[in-house]
Amino acid sequence: MLMTMTEEARYVFRELRAEDLDSWLETRRLCFPEDAVMDEEGFHRAHTLNPAGGRVLVGVCGEEVVSSYVAQPMRVRLGTEDVYFCHVVDSMVHPEHRKGLKNPGLFVRTAQAFFDRFGDMDAVHYGWPVERAQRIDRRFLEYKVVREELALVCELGPDSGAAEGDVVELTEAGPEVFALWERCALRWEASAVRDADYLRWRFFEHPSRRYTVLAALATDGSLEGLCVVGEDEIQAEGARALVDWLVPADEPEVAARARTP
């Protein structure tokens, strides 16, 4: 009896292995030709060195990675419990494998395999999908729009001179930063845990983006507030992005000093 392999049976879904990486990188290059080419170092920086771990699920055809669903986890304090929120990134299907499968297609099947493997590990999965992916996500994966993000822009004002103390640049995060975050988090329902490992990975040792971490100090030298400015986040002359802000809600005078240019 002659047996043929159906198109669906061609694919194996599993976690990424070390020997898959070259193929994964090549498929990513084909799927995102407008993006900067990611190399092995960039992959490990994004998905292996993350102190919260990694979530990489691939669809393999033969020895070739032809689809992928990936998320970057982040440890989050939710109430009194630490959980993981995951930012979905680098979800893709090789151009030569996007046709010929009935709905739900290879993208959805890869995502379903991802959630079968990792779904119970995380409290939230979120992202900013392109329009086509958003339609698929809402139809097959039960994604919902939480809100539309806005870009808030303002001019920096002059120093009010109302608060005492210094603003200095930090080059590393000590335990005092974590203690400041814990003070702030008491009033927040959910907040990324800003420990030294996270801040080092996210800001201080980022290989391709420049961040300036500013600390507001009290007159006795203790840490009162912190903000992070992204130098390369916004493509506009003279513009900078405020990418993190740690100031206790009941200490507005610290916020005034942190806003000083």
Language-model features: locations:
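Tryptophan-centric aromatic hotspots in well-structured domains and transmembrane helices
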Residues: 43-47, 69-71, 128, 143-145, ...
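A short helix-loop-beta-strand connector motif used in the catalytic cores of GNAT acetyltransferases and
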Residues: 47-61, 67, 121-122, 203-214
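Long, well-ordered mid-to-C-terminal structural blocks that present hydrophobic/aromatic surfaces
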Residues: 202-250, 254-255
